[in-house]
Amino acid sequence: MFIVLLKYPNSTVNFSASPAHALTPFQVYDRDEWEEYLSQYDPNDFNQMKPLFNEYFFKVKNKIYNVHHKAVVMLSLEKALLAENYNFSELLEFDDETCFYFPYNWKIKKPRSFFKDIYYLMFTNWGEEVINAGYKISPPNEIL
């Protein structure tokens, strides 16, 4: 049997995704103007966050990710959401080692709920395409 590993777009590096993959556009390390802009939004109000995810995550990733990348991203988050004791707070912590920082004023009060909302958006944007490609992903109402 021959297995081809999925690569990052335009790269030779193997593709992987953590449950926090959708947060990458909101990283503000060394991006003061971006932090100032994002600080206007309340991450605890998903009505405010939805347009940000649509514009800075889905719109960008739809141009570069194929259905297999989308499936890997969704399945990673789905697996975490299905794990009853998964520590979503850990994904939101500032990380000096990787230089991962959110806007200073972003304090997400209900991390699991925040990631459930992200999964819902993923399913809305990518679910049909991923399912039609043969992947088994859970609809949001089965895991939320």
Model-derived features with residue positions:
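Short terminal alpha-helical segments
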Residues: 1-55, 119, 123
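Amphipathic alpha-helical interaction modules
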Residues: 32-85
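Short runs of predominantly hydrophobic/aromatic residues within well-ordered alpha helices
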Residues: 12, 16, 70-74, 111, ...
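Charged, low-complexity surface segments at secondary-structure and domain boundaries
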Residues: 2-5, 38, 57-63, 99-104
